[in-house]
Curated annotation (Swiss-Prot):
Family per similarity comment: Belongs to the aTrm56 family.
Binding-site residues, S-adenosyl-L-methionine: 84, 110-114
This protein's name: tRNA (cytidine(56)-2'-O)-methyltransferase
UniProt xrefs under HAMAP family: tRNA_methyltr_aTrm56 (MF_00077)
Enzyme class name: transferase
GO annotation, biological process: tRNA nucleoside ribose methylation
PANTHER family on file: TRNA (CYTIDINE(56)-2'-O)-METHYLTRANSFERASE
Functional note: Specifically catalyzes the AdoMet-dependent 2'-O-ribose methylation of cytidine at position 56 in tRNAs.
Catalytic activities: cytidine(56) in tRNA + S-adenosyl-L-methionine = 2'-O-methylcytidine(56) in tRNA + S-adenosyl-L-homocysteine + H(+)
A Pfam family the protein falls into: Trm56
Cellular localisation: Cytoplasm
Amino acid sequence: MKIYVLRYGHRPGRDKRITTHVGLVARAFGAHGFILGDVIDEKVIGSIKKVMERWGGNLYIDAGVDSRKYVLEWKRRGGIVVHLTMYGLHIDDVIDEIRGLNKDILIVVGAEKVPPFFYEVADYNVAIGHQPHSEVAALAVFLDRFYMGKELHLSFPNAKLIIVPSPRGKKVKKIAEEEEGESTKD
């Protein structure tokens, strides 16, 4: 089972920071792919790839795909579509059912006003809460609930840097220098 995140409605002049954060949360919280629908924004893709070069991971990334066709093809191949929206069913009421299907999941995260198509084609319209909030927060909460917190303990292949947990300060270990000693940044 794989989870991909489709970012719909990205506006390059306005949304690059938030869309980058959607991609970074997808990676950090255990998604397998990030799709930037309908546009190609090299800054967003470059930022996510730069993080992966340093911090590891094998997140599949694509951009410029037709969002509607991608969703329809996902469903045709037997996957389910989850649209995160504050208007949907509460996550507590559907997360166990979604997890229990054991199918590939495409999570749709909108930027601009989401057209009715996505509400209608989604197998689940899921609300993290029924109040306005960030799509980044919604994705993080959904993935955390889906994986039941296990994603917070992921380690990423090919990492050049890892965090060394510390009660104070910042400690970062360079993996390439592991044999020579620990490198820290304070």
